[in-house]
């Protein structure tokens, strides 16, 4: 239904999640301005209208979701570079069979299928240049990693197509061994995603969720749901998935 797909709007996603008591990234409620410390003549000035401010756009709110920058919790930080790593999230794909039958979806229609941890690089703004470490969805064991940075670059017709394999066992910036580490609360994280899928978008067949572990207690926070998603090279329950889409 259209209501399910409203959550593609990142602001509506946050509001609906809060209404459903789902832990998401906190936001600020006021507009902000940013000034360059040296530029003059108004050249270094930017004004951002907050989506939370209903005074903009006839009550719809502004274009920008304004949030305080979050940091990785101790568990993930122990595997990341010390110098300015980005928030390094788990990408978890969940599925729903709720659209295959008439009436309301049931909780057991929802299943989390795969998990990949995006180990961010030193001084990167986001985890889009990360090493994608496959995480076993049942045991939480972090397996080998691969790349997908070439997905975000135009590829001229005369340029050789980039292929990558699961060959990374260590973080390239620190040489720290990642493969073999255990995400001990993997089931808790997968359940967290399944609950979000059920409460927010029970009839959407597939969604990719970005989950962060933040603060001293490695608090689970949902950043967003991605409706145009893929498995990011992660292990998934193939037979269950194939039967669902058949």
Where are each of the predicted segments found?
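Active-site nucleotide/adenylate-binding loops and adjacent lid/helix of ATP-dependent enzymes
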Residues: 1-99, 113
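A short linear hydrophobic-aromatic micro-motif
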Residues: 32, 206-209
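Protein kinase-like catalytic core scaffold
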Residues: 32, 111, 221-223
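Short, solvent-exposed loop/turn segments at secondary-structure junctions
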Residues: 38-40, 71-72, 99, 117-122, ...
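Short helix/loop capping segments that flank catalytic or ligand/cofactor-binding pockets
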Residues: 42-44, 74-76, 102-103, 123-125, ...
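Hydrophobic/aromatic-lined pockets within catalytic cores
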Residues: 74, 97, 120, 198-201
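ATP-dependent carboxylate/phosphate-activation module, predominantly the ATP-grasp catalytic core
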Residues: 79-191
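C-terminal active-site "lid" helix and adjoining low-complexity regulatory extension at the edge
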Residues: 164-188, 194, 198-206, 213-246
């Amino acid at each position: 239904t259209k209501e399910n797909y409203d959550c593609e709007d990142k602001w509506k996603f946050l509001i609906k999640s809060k209404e459903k008591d789902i832990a998401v990234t906190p936001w600020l409620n006021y507009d902000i301005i940013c000034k360059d410390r040296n530029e003059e003549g108004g050249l270094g000035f930017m004004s951002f209208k907050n989506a939370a401010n209903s005074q903009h756009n006839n009550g719809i709110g502004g274009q920008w979701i304004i949030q305080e920058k979050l940091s990785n919790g101790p568990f993930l930080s122990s595997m990341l570079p010390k110098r300015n790593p980005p928030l390094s999230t788990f990408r978890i794909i969940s599925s729903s069979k709720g659209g295959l039958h008439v009436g309301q979806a049931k909780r057991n229609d929802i299943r989390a299928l795969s998990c990949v941890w995006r180990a961010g690089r030193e001084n990167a703004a986001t985890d889009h240049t990360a090493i994608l470490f496959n995480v076993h969805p049942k045991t939480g064991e972090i397996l080998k990693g691969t790349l997908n940075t070439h997905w975000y670059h135009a590829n001229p017709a005369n340029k050789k197509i980039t292929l990558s394999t699961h060959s990374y066992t260590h973080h390239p910036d620190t040489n720290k061994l990642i493969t073999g580490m255990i995400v001990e609360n993997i089931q808790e994280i997968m359940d967290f995603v399944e609950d979000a899928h059920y409460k927010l978008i029970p009839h959407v067949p597939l969604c990719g969720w970005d989950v962060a572990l933040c603060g001293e207690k490695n608090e689970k926070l949902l950043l967003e749901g991605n409706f145009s998603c893929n498995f990011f090279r992660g292990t998934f329950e193939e037979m269950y998935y194939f039967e669902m889409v058949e």
